[in-house]
Structure formats: structure tokens, C-alpha cells
Amino acid sequence: MGAKFDIFKKLPDGHPLWVKAVDGLEEAKVQLARIAASSPGEYFIYSVRNACIVHARMVPQG
């Protein structure tokens, strides 16, 4: 089991919406890409261990 990461979607008002928890950064990136493909927007991956954002992705809508 790898390190824990949380995937969040940034809402239009700037607040984060928790999407899911994932084991391992590479798996978190794969899951983020899948989620963003079906629901475009701004997402980020948060490292639970390091208490910081480690990856962000913007998927334009439209």
C-alpha cells in the first residue's frame, strides 16, 4: 500500500470538493484523469502525509 492522496475538485466559488482517496501518487493521477474526462473542471491531488497539494490539473469545459 502506498502513500495516501485525496483528489479534490475546485468549485466555482473557490472551495474544494473532496472526490475520493487513493493509494499512491501515480494511481491518483490516473484516477484524476478519468474523473476529469467525464466531469471537466479544476482538480488537485493532496498528499495526506505531507499536507500539501502535489499535482493540479485544469480541464476546460465545453
Residue ranges and their predicted role:
Residues 14-26:
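A short, exposed loop/beta-hairpin motif centered on an aromatic-Gly-Thr core
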Residues 37-62:
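Short, mixed-charge low-complexity intrinsically disordered segments
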Residues 1, 29-37:
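Short linear motifs in intrinsically disordered
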Residues 26-31, 62:
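Short, surface-exposed linear segments at secondary-structure transitions and domain or protein termini
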Residues 1-17:
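Short aromatic-glycine-(Arg/Gly/Cys) micro-motifs in beta-strand/loop hairpins
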Residues 10-12, 25, 48:
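Generic structural motif
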Residues 15-18, 31, 49, 55:
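Generic short amphipathic/hydrophobic targeting helices enriched at N-termini
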